[in-house]
Amino acid sequence: MKSTALFRLTFVYHPKNQNEAAEYESALARAFSTVTRAPFVSNLDVPLDVWDRVEFKSITDKSAWDILEGNDAIIRNTLYVVLLTEQLVNDPLMSQVLDSIAARVHAARKVGGHDLLAYSLSTIAIRKAPPVFSNRQVKNAASLGEDRIIAHKLGLIALHRTRLILGAEKEPETLKLFISHAKHDGIFFAQALENCIRDIPELEAWYDAKDIGNGEEWLAAIQEAAGACVFVALRTNAYEFRTICLDEFMVAFSNGMPMVVVDALMQSVSGPSAVPFAAVPNIRIEDGNTYRVLTAALREHIRLLLMRNVAGERSDATTPSQVWLRLPSPAAAKLAIAFRQASPSALWLVPKAQTRPEEFSALRDWLATSNPPIELDYLESAR
């Protein structure tokens, strides 16, 4: 039986605006798509892919909305992306759809789970729409120097809003990125990525090694930011020969921080490496499109948040759980225990595909001796 969706993106536009909506619809579908995998023929358990439980729906008429609304009660998390046009607000039936969206977003102010991203192609349309649409417009769109926002930028903002719906920290709302690079040959790409971040409304934060102290303070900062930040490693030819870069990578890796590796090597094929680059998502951008790096970073953070939602379904509500993207090292586990609050998590969950059985068993036995004891389990099998 198919599992209930953890999240749904609903794109609403008027059918007369299909030509204008096509590029935005395509960009949103790509941003939230599930990666097609080859048939799984192993005798082992099928790896958990939380993106399988993300839905994308387009609504262009009232009847389709009524069908969706009738089945939507069990979808806890929904982002409505609405292309506001005069045709949409002047259509009596589609106006009812806008009123329904406004009511859902208003009701979600206290409990969360639903939000709205409005992009208006007309000042008249935004004035005629329910007031909540004005408050949920794309921020600072005018600062882009364009009459219309580029489609892939809308996709990035939608991914960011999804983070907030799924439980990312709302203060501050901006995405935090830690950019790890070797200044010898990575500084220019890092600066290009920074400019790309500044070009996207709501994605303004920038983390670099210079912003964090060294030693224990740096380790503490990584630990505290592990669940609310994305680590981007710019893998250039000099990266593996810089001790500080390797230290940054391994600390972030062992502490379960969402990570993306940007393959910026001069050669397209590289030899074996002692650094576990292949254990995290890799992206190569030979055409220089830095927006794909942001897409990968946002999706990796959303993957962690979706896994937390899965954990909430599968674990006892009275037992707080902590999700790790990868099995933490003993040193990282000790640090995590040191940072626990007065009501510590009693259950740690990790995807089975990211563990070796002997390492999992060793860490589970060690955690059982901690004070208070912590239980370690696979995310797929936790009940």
Each predicted region: which residue ranges?
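Conserved N-terminal substructure of TIR/SEFIR domains
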Residues: 1-84, 94-104, 109-112, 122, ...
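Short glycine-/small-residue-rich Rossmann-like dinucleotide-binding loops
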Residues: 85-86, 236-237
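Short amphipathic alpha-helical segments
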Residues: 93-96, 131, 191-192, 244-247, ...
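Glycine-rich, charge-decorated loop segments at or immediately adjacent to ligand/cofactor-binding or catalytic sites
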Residues: 123-137, 218, 267-282
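Short secondary-structure boundary motifs at beta->alpha junctions and helix caps
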Residues: 134-149, 278-292
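Catalytic core segments in nucleotide and nucleic-acid processing enzymes
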Residues: 237, 249-251, 259-267, 277
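Nucleotide-sugar-dependent
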Residues: 238-243
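Leloir-type glycosyltransferase catalytic cores
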Residues: 283-307
